[in-house]
Amino acid sequence: MQKLPEAKLETPFQTAALTVLALCTYSADRNIGTEMLNWLRGPRPLNGQDISFLNDRFRDGKTYLPFTYFAGSTPDNNYTPTKPYSITIESNHVSGEEQGYMKLFIPCGGANSPRLIKLRQRGSDGKWFLGEQYLLTGVRTPKSEDPWA
């Protein structure tokens, strides 16, 4: 991930997109995903509570959760994104209210409203790091897992 152009972390949008990528990786390999998330968090790595939260969200086969943020992902196609893969990241009137922080929003194919991710800028070099993410909250059940579909 660190070889991608977005890994310069020059904008909060780059860091937000890489966070979705890291969460996708975490769903497949927790060790590599943890390394990626720790790198994105900069001087504030994941603690035990953070890791417990992540493990809880991916419990019961919910590995599809981070894929709901890719274009084309819907419950009807079991959150299979269209190619080429793309993610939309939005800002709004509250995004830059707090100095050194940026609140961004990522539309989700399994929810009615975009989900929040909060980034923090490091003063010494201007790079943007992951502060908080609210991307792993409940979404509509994929069609293949919905007994009512």
Task: Annotate each language-model stretch with its function.
Residues 17-22, 86-88, 103-105, 114-118, ...:
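Ordered hydrophobic segments in well-structured contexts
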Residues 52-112:
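Surface-exposed, charged secondary-structure patches
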Residues 1-71:
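Core segments of small alpha/beta cavity-forming domains
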Residues 107-148:
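Short beta-strand edge/turn micro-motifs at domain boundaries
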